[in-house]
Amino acid sequence: MRHILLYWNHICVLHRQEKTFLDALAQRLLSDEIQLEVRYFGLGYPEHMSEYLARPDAILPDLIVSADLEVFEDTDIFCKLNHSLYPVRSWIPLQSGPMLDAVERGSFLLPFLSIPLVYYTREPEICRRTALTDWNGLAFGGINNSAVKTVVKTVWERWGSQAAQRLLERSLVTDIPIGAFQAVRQKQAATALVPSLYALRADGQETFLQIPEEGPVLIPSYFCARTSIPQSIACRMAKEILCPELCSFYAANGDLIVYPEHTSQKSRQEYSGACCPSAPWLERLTHEEFYHLYCQKLPKASDWQADLKP
């Protein structure tokens, strides 16, 4: 029996269905002498995947599916993985275009899907003419997950660190993304940058969905596979996980931008451009540099490196 350890930190609002899918997959694989063990991270579990992998005693998995982007973007974490990864990017054909171009991270990470962040607003005309860096009073949320971090990194790369600081100073930043959505519903803010699944609840009379002028801000997820298992099995697992069934489910139920080309349905937020930090810029950003700014402006933010110190 071949044992495979998969770490999973993905789409929390669809997690019940994700778990049902993975339970069924694990059961099917048993007939082929494959024992799939899935360890879950994120909302509803004790820790995020990046927090666990940062620990000195962390056990490395065979496979990862993660929208916790610090796993891949924090060089102090990714260095534990990047010397033992297969070139998975070529294993599954993906839909080309600006949505994919924005999230490419090299040959060792296979883009799975992206959560598009768009405006949920009472002021659509202002949204149409306001750059992401120019907002005063914008709500957005997810302090200790990838949502706020990606917005901050996007602004930082395009407009500089001072622009990122100003955005945090002038915004209503909530613990989780739905908190920003609720801030607009409760009229604590006029506009929120939220997952499109929330913004689609706009009634078209008092509240509206508006794509940012720069395009949606993308929160991507990636699949990667370590050389701890044979390549043939790793490749099979990529195809089993990024299968038409799960991809179509994500597109239909989450309004997610799903990259495998066999996906039949597209997100309504696909656009001529998109915002996401680039791989070369992320490679230059140090842990200390990012978290110094981030934690200084957001007292609720946690820095795993500081948390590990005795």
Predicted regions and their residues:
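Early extracytoplasmic/lumenal segment of secretory-pathway proteins
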Residues: 1-75
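Ligand-binding pocket segment of bilobal, Venus flytrap-like solute-binding proteins
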Residues: 71, 154-212
